[in-house]
Every structure is written in structure tokens, then in C-alpha cells.
């Protein structure tokens, strides 16, 4: 669902905090916004046209090259606080 920035960041902070608990329950997070890939998320799967486009460790997959190919347009990924941010070139 499309949360406003404040609500989104609150939800992501709760997920990040809960992931650090000793008895943390693994979770799958589905999003269209790469900036929502929090530090607790270690691996990603990118889907395109209903098929797996790429999967693996987030730092290996969320790159300028992979995302530019997937989105069919030039993009740049900037990492800030272990979170990726997408910039359209």
C-alpha cells in the first residue's frame, strides 16, 4: 500500500528493529520501491513480466547496470545508511 513517508519509515524501522531480536521471524517484503530495502534485507529477487529477472545478495543485484537493464532506462543507485536510493539519469 502507498504509505506516506513518515508512516513508511516507521514501518521500516519496526521491521529493522524486529529483525535484530534473537527470535526474529524471517519475512518476505514485497515492494516496487528499492529505497525500502532496509539493512535487515540481505537478498532480493527482481521480477519483470512475471518472471525472475535477477536474484541474489542485494549489493550484487541492486546496481546501476542490473536496474538500468531491468527498467530499460539509465538509472544510478546511491547507497546511504545501507539502503539503496534510485536516481533516474
Identify what each model region corresponds to.
Residues 45:
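Conserved catalytic/dimer-interface elements of ABC ATPase nucleotide-binding domains
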Residues 70-89:
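ABC ATPase nucleotide-binding domains
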Residues 31-32:
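H-loop/switch region of ABC-family ATPase nucleotide-binding domains
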Residues 55-56:
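ABC ATPase "signature
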Residues 5-7:
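Helix N-cap at the start of a conserved alpha-helix in ABC-type nucleotide-binding domains
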Residues 37-39:
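A short, surface-exposed alpha-helical micro-motif characterized by mixed small hydrophobic
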Residues 9-23:
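Helical segment within the ABC ATPase nucleotide-binding domain
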Amino acid at each position: 500500500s502507498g504509505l506516506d513517508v513518515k508512516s513508511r519509515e516507521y514501518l521500516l524501522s519496526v521491521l529493522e528493529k524486529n529483525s535484530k531480536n534473537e527470535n526474529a521471524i524471517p519475512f518476505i517484503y514485497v515492494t516496487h520501491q528499492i529505497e525500502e530495502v532496509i539493512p535487515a534485507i540481505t537478498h532480493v529477487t527482481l521480477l519483470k513480466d512475471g518472471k525472475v529477472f535477477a536474484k541474489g545478495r542485494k549489493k550484487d543485484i541492486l546496481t546501476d547496470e542490473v536496474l538500468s537493464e531491468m527498467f530499460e532506462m539509465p538509472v544510478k543507485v546511491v547507497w546511504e545508511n545501507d539502503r539503496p536510493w534510485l536516481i533516474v539519469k
